[in-house]
Amino acid sequence: MNRPKREKKSITDVSTLKSLEQIKRARDGEKRTDQLQEEDDERKRLEQLKEQETEFDKEERKRKNRDFIEGDSGYRETSDNEDEDEDEDDDGDNSDDDYSLDEDDEDGGGDGENNDSDQEEAIEVGRKKKRQVKKKSKKDENGEPKVKTPRVKKTKEKKNEIVPEKNRIIQFINNPTESKSTSNNESFFFDKLKKSNSNTLNSTNSTLNSNELSSGGTMSSLDIESMLNDLQSAPDSELDLEKLKEKQLELEKKLEKEALLNKPTISTETIITEGVELDDNYEFDFDFNNPITTNNNNNNNTKTTTTTTTTTITNKNLNKVNSMSLPTRPQAQQFISPKQTNQEDWWSKTGVDSVVLVKKLEEIMPKNSDLLKMNMDGSLDFFLLTTEEDKQGRIILFGKVKLQASKSNKPGGGGGATKQTSITDEPVTKVPLKYASCCIIIEKMERNVFFLPRDYKLDQDGESTTIQVTDTMIEAELKQLVDRSKIKDYKLKKVKRTSAFDYSVPHKNGPVGEQHYVWKLSYPSNQMVFPNDIKGSTFRCAYGITSSPVELFLIKRKIMGPTWLTVSGITLNFDQKKSFARYEATVKSFKSIKPSMYKNEPSPPLTVMSISTKSVMKGSSHEVVMISSVIHESISADGPTENQDSIKYITAIRPLTGQVFPPDFQKPGASTTKQNVTICTSERNLLSFFCETVLNADPDVFAGHNIIGYDIEVILDRLEKLKVMEWAFIGRLKRSSFDRFNHISGRLICDSYLVCKEFLPKEKNYSLVELSKNQLSINKPEINYLSIEPYFETTKKLNIFIEINENDCYIIFLLIFKLLVFPLTKQLTNLAGNQWDKSLKSNRAERIEYLLLHNFHEKKYLLPDKIYQKSSSSGGGGGAKDKDNHAAYSGGLVLDPKIDFYDRYVVLLDFNSLYPSIIQEYNVCFTTINRVKRDDGKWEEAMPPPSSIEKGILPKVLHGLVSKRREIKKRMEQEKNKIIKAQYDIQQQAVKLIANSMYGCLGFSHSRFYALPLAELVTRKGRENLQKGASIVNKMCYDVIYGDTDSLMIYTGVGTFNEAETIGKEIQKKINDQYRGSVMEIGLDGIFKRLLLFKKKKYACLKEFRIDSTTTKCERENKGIDIVRRDYCDLTKDIGQWVLNLILGGEEKIALFSLIKEYLESVQQQIKDNTLAVEKFIITKTLSKQPEEYNDADIQPHVQVALQMRAKGLHVQPGEQVPYIITHGNSSSDIKEEWHHRARAPSDVESIQDVDIDWYLSQQILPSIQRNTGPIGMEPHELAQWLGMTGTKYQKQFDHLQQQSNQDFKPRYTLSTEDLRYKQCKSFNFECPYCGQNNEFTGIVKIDSEGKSESGFDCNQCHAKIPLKKLANQLQLNIRTYLKQYNDWDLRCTECEKVSKNYKETSYRCARPQCRGKMIQIMTSSKLFNQISFFSKLFRNDLSNSDNTTTIIPNEDQNTLKQAKQIIDSFLSKFDQYNVNLNSLLTPSQTLDSFNNYLASSRASIQYPILNK
C-alpha cells in the first residue's frame, strides 16, 4: 500500500502565508510559533500513543512485521507462493494504516523475530485476511468483475534545493514599489497579496511573468519555509518591520489600482429628462451623473441635471426632466464592520470601566441595611417600577431605593446615579444619589365583591315570591356562601354604589346613574374566586369579581404609574430571600403603602441592558452561538439622558458545534484581542454566563429589537431545554420551576420594534436596518442569517461578527434616546395610572381603561367587568365590528372625491380633535345617557342629554387633559432651560396621546368600557359637523372636492399662496362662527399648490407652507397611493415617484406626455437589456400570524415564502415583513404555475432572467402608472405600448380606443365597467345561431379593427344579425341563472373558499375543522341587483355626445333595445331600491321632467380629454 506523498508548499500558496509575527521571531533567531506548535503536537502525539498502547496493539504490530515489507513504493503485503500472480490486487490506500505503520516500524520491529509461536500465529492471521480482501477487490460496487490495471511504479522525486539568501526580505524593503521590474522578494509579497485577494482579481493576475523575476531563481521554486529558516539561522536585528508594513500597504494600494483597471464596466442608457427636482425622502437609487446648477431666473433655458433628490420642489417652472438611469445589480454582500461605515466609533469612547465584572451571588448581595437610606419614622422611600402577583395571591413590588450618599461603595449592579433636573419648585439635591434594586412583598391583599340585593326573594325553583328581602336575609345567605366556599378572614358590610355600565351578564345591567345599597365582601386574595354570573335567592348579581388583586391595589392606593411610594412597617430580609433584588422587605398589609408626599421628586436613573442574540438552526431549534449586551446604568426617566456614552458592553460567544475557533482568536497579547469578549466552551456555558451577567448588572429594563418575539423566546427555550441551573437569574424573582409565561418578573421589557410602530407610524419598514437608516442616518451592516457559519472561519470575520452584534445593541440605545422612550412612556403611565411595562408594549387600550377605572372608582361607581379576549384591533373612528365582522355602526363621513388634477391652490381645513371635542360639547358619558336595547337585541339610537344635566366623568376627564396640556405648553414657551423644556414637551405629547385615544374605548368591542350607542352618537355628530362645514363652504361659492371624517379639501381657483391663505382663513372664521362658546373648532391645516386626487383616501400633493413672512417652501406629500405601499416593488415606486414628481413639477400637459413617453421607453429598454437589479422587484408584506395558521396559505405568496424560509431554518414571526419576488417558477414544467406559487425569497433569485417581468408589468407597473396619470388624461393602451407591452392580450383591450373618429363613443360603450358598482359584474354573452360563436355584448355600438362602427348585436365572426327572439330568450336565461344562484343560497368561506350550504348555526362560521373563516352568501341581493342593473346600463340607447340617436342606431336595433329594456325592467321592478320616488329630491318649483332635462344638459356639456400627441 502506497503512502501518499506530501505536496511541497509553494510560496504563492495562501495556506503558507506567514504573518509579521513569524518574521519578527525569525529575525531574532527564535523558533517560530508554528514550529513550537508542531513540536508540542508531535510530543503530545507520541505520549498519547505510548499511553494508549495495549496488548492488542502489540499483536497487531507483530502481524504487520510478519506480513508487510517496505519497498520503494511504500508498505505492501508479502506474497505467498500460491498468490504471487495476484500481487497487484493487494494494493491499499488506507492512510490510517500507513500512519500506524510508521510508528510500528520504528519501535516494534523486533518482536516477531524473538518469538516463533507469535510469528506463526501472525502469519496465519495475515493470510486469512489477505484472501478476504482479494475476494472483495475482484468485484466492483455493482458486483461486476473489476478490470485489472497495471500499477505504475512511482519514482522518488528529489526536492529542489534553494540557495539560502538571508537578505531577501531586506532587499524587498529597499526596492521601490513602483519599479517596473519586480525583484524576486517583491514578487513574493506582491504574489502573497494577490493570492489573499483572489476573490476580486482574476487568477491569471495572481502570478507574475517569469521574465520579471531576477536571475536568483523563479518564484515557483521559492519556499517560504526556506526563507524564514534562512533568516532564523542568520538573525538580523536591523530588519525594520515598520518599513515592511509600509511596503505591504504600498503593494495593497497597487493591487487595488490594478483591480480597478481590470474591473468590468456596465454601461446603461440614459435619457435626458431635465428640469424637475426630486424628493430625497424617497429612495430612487438612480444614477445622476452631473451636479445641478440652480438659477433664480424663470426664463433660464440651460439644461440642468442633479446629483441628489430633494424633498423640496421649487416654485420655478422648469421645462425638462433630469437625466437618470435605473441601477444595475449590486455586488455580493461583503463582511463589513460597523467601524467602516458612516457610524461613529463608539467603542473608542469606552475605557476600562466598560468591562462588566461578573461575581458570585454572595459577593454582590448586601448583608445588612447599613447602606440603605431610611426615613426618621422607620419608613422607606420606594420608587415603583413594576408589579407582580404570585400564585399565593401576594402582591410583589419591584423598584429602587436610595442609598446613603455618604458611602462611597454600593452593591454591585445597583446602577449609578446622575444628577436629575426637576421641573418642580422643590430644591434639587446637589449630592449625587445612589440607588439599588428593591423588592417589596405584600403578604395580605384582598378582593372586593359587591352583591346587589333583590327586591323579592326567590323560592327553591327560582321563581319570584312576594317576600321582600331584608338585610338579615341577605347577610345570612352571604355568610352561608362564604362558609360553603371555605373563605376565612372576611369582612361584610353594606355600602352605597352607583351603576352606569353595560355588562355581558344580562342580569347585571341596571338603570344608568341609579344608586344602590350593595353588600361589600372583602376577603384575602389567595382564596377562591366566585363565578362571574353568580346569583342567589336574596341577591341578584355580584360585581368586581373579575378585578385582579394588582388592579385593586393600584386603584385603592391611588398609585398612578411609576412614582415614589412611602412604605411603612417593613421587615428587611437578608436570609432566605425570595428575590434576586439587592434589598428585600416584607409588609403585612397593602394599606402600609401610599404615594409619597414628595412624588414629584426626580425619578432614579434606570439601568438598561440591551441584548442581541445570534443563533444557528439545528433541526427545529435555535442554538445560541453569541449574546451581546450593552449596559447603561444612568438613563433618565424624566427627560433626555445627559451622559449617553457612559456604557458597558460584553459579548459571550462559543464555537460552532464540532468546530474550534481560529488559533489567533482572543489570543492573549494580540492586537485583535477584545477585553469585553468572553469565550464559552458550549451553549450551556454561554447561557449560564449570560444569566450570571444579568445577575451582576441587575438591569431594570431589558431592551432589544423584537426582543419579545425572538431574543427572549430563544433564550428561554434554550435555558429550559439545556436545564441551565442559573435560569432564574434572568428575572428578579426566585423560582423553583420554569414558568414561560411569567419568566422575567421584576424587569421591564422595552421592545424597540413595538415602540417604533407606535411612535413612528409613518415608517414603512420597522427592521433595525431601515430604522437606523431613516431615523439615525446610519448604514448599519446586517448579518446574513442564512450563513452565520462563514463568520467563524477567520479571526477577522469573527471580530466583525462580534462588532455587528454589539453595534445592534448600541443602535437600540440611539433609538431610545432619540424617541425619548422612557420619559414619554413614563408620562403616559403617570397620566393613566396603569403599569409601565404595558405602556412599553404599546397597550393603548389599557391606558384608557386604567384612567377611567381610577376616576370612576373615586366617584364610587360599580366598575365594569374585565374582558379577557384577544384582539389585534384597538378601535378607532371607522366604526366597530360586530361578532359577524359587519360594521356595528357608521364611522366618519367620507365625501365623494372629485377626481382630477388641480394645478391651482387647494386648502385643507381640519377639526381640532374632533371626537374629544364632541364628547365635551355634547356631554357624552356613561353617566349622562341611557342606553336602551330593542326587542331584536339592537341598541336604540342614543341622543345627547339636556344641557341641564351635570357634566359626566368622560367630559370632565377630557377637559382636565386639555387644560393640563394648555398649561404645559404655556410653561414650555416660557422655559429657557433646554432639558426642562424637553421634559415639558414630553408631557404635552403624552397628554395629547391620551386625549385622542379616549374615543377608542367607546368603539372598541373588546374594551372594558365599550358602549356602542355612545360611539355611534360621537361619529354621528362628527358626520353632521363635517356636512355642516361643507354646506357653509358651498354657500361661500367654493368647491369642496373631498372630505374625510374631520377634514375638508376646498378648491380655491387662485394662483398665489397669499390668496389661498386668505381664503382659507376666511372659510375657517365662517365655520367657527357657528361654534361660538364651544370647544368645537376648525383650523387651516394645509395649503396645496398642486393636487392629484385619485379616489377616497388616495392623493398626492405639493404642500406649500410659510417659513417666514416673505418665504414659503414646498414639500411632496403622498397618502394611500402605490408608492407608499409595501406590497409594491421598488421599481414600481421609483417609476411612480418619478411620474408624480414630473406632474406636480408644473410642466405643461403636452410636455408631460412626451417626457413620460421617453422615460417609459427608457425603462422598457433597460428591462430588455436585463440591467435592472433583482432587488428592484422585491415585494414585502406583513405576516399577520404564524404561517401555519393561514387557511389560504396556497394563494398567499408571502406565506409561501415564509414557509420556505422556515424550512431553511430562518426565524420568521408574526409582524415581520416578508420579502419575495415573483419568478417564472419551475422551468421544467410545461404548465405555468399560478403567480402566487412562483413567489421566491430574494436570496433564491439568482439573476434578472428568473424574474417574471410580464407579471410585474401587467400587475404592478402599468396599473400604477395608469392610476397616477389618469387624472391628466393619459390612455392606458399608450402607456402599455411605451413599456413594450405589445402582446395581443393588451392590444385587444386598447386597439379600438386609438380611433379618433369614434372618440365620442368611448365614455358610454367602451368603458362601461369603470363604475365601481359594476366592477365585479359579468358581461352579457350571447351565442350566434348561425356559426355558434360566443359573443360578448359590450354595448349597442362597437368599433371594429378598421375603426368603423357597427351594431353590437352583430356576430363578431360571421357578422350576422342576431334574431330578436333569440337574443331576448338568451337574455332571460342569463338573468334567471343569477336568480337561481341567489335562490340556491350557496355560501363561500372567506378563508378556505369552500362552497357549501352548511355552516355553524350560531356564528355562520365555516363547518370545516380548524377553519375560522366565515360563510358568506355568494350571490347577495345587492350583487344580484347590480348585475341586472349592469345589463340595463349595457342596453341604454343614449349617446354621450349625440343629440340624434336615431341617426346612429338602426330601427331594428331600436326594437331590440326596447324589448331588452322591458325584460330587464321586469326583473328590476321586484327590487325595493329600484322603486325610488325622486320627487322628494326636487324643490317646489321643479318638476321631474325639468330635473331630467337639467341632468341631460349637464351631461352633454362635459368635455372629455382627448390625447394630444
Curated annotation (Swiss-Prot):
For Zn(2+) 2, which residues are the binding ones? C1389, C1392, C1406, C1411
Q: Where is the composition biased (Basic residues)?
A: 127-137, 148-157
Q: What class of enzyme is it?
A: transferase
In chain numbering, motif CysB motif lies across 1389-1411
Skewed-composition ranges (Basic and acidic residues): 21-35, 42-79, 138-147
Ranges annotated as biased composition (Acidic residues): 80-123
Gene Ontology BP terms = DNA replication initiation; DNA synthesis involved in DNA repair; lagging strand elongation; leading strand elongation; mitotic DNA replication initiation
Enumerate the GO terms in the molecular function aspect.
chromatin binding; DNA replication origin binding; DNA-directed DNA polymerase activity; nucleotide binding; single-stranded DNA binding; zinc ion binding
Q: Which SMART domains match?
A: POLBc
Per the record, the coiled-coil ranges are: 27-67, 234-263, 958-989
Which of this chain's residues are annotated to bind Zn(2+) 1? C1328, C1331, C1355, C1358
Task: Cite the InterPro entries for this sequence.
Answer: DNA-dir_DNA_pol_B, DNA-dir_DNA_pol_B_CS, DNA-dir_DNA_pol_B_exonuc, DNA-dir_DNA_pol_B_multi_dom, DNA/RNA_pol_sf, DNA_pol_B_thumb, DNA_pol_palm_dom_sf, Pol_alpha_znc_sf
Stretch list, region Disordered: 1-162
Question: Per UniProt, which keywords does this protein have?
Answer: Coiled coil, DNA replication, DNA-binding, DNA-directed DNA polymerase, Metal-binding, Nucleotidyltransferase, Nucleus, Transferase, Zinc, Zinc-finger
Q: Where in the cell is it found?
A: Nucleus
One CC-aspect GO term: alpha DNA polymerase:primase complex
What does the UniProt function comment say about this protein? Polymerase alpha in a complex with DNA primase is a replicative polymerase.
Q: Recite the other comments.
A: In eukaryotes there are five DNA polymerases: alpha, beta, gamma, delta, and epsilon which are responsible for different reactions of DNA synthesis.
NCBIfam families xref list: pol2 (TIGR00592)
Q: Which family does it belong to?
A: Belongs to the DNA polymerase type-B family.
The protein's name is DNA polymerase alpha catalytic subunit
The organism encoding this protein is Dictyostelium discoideum
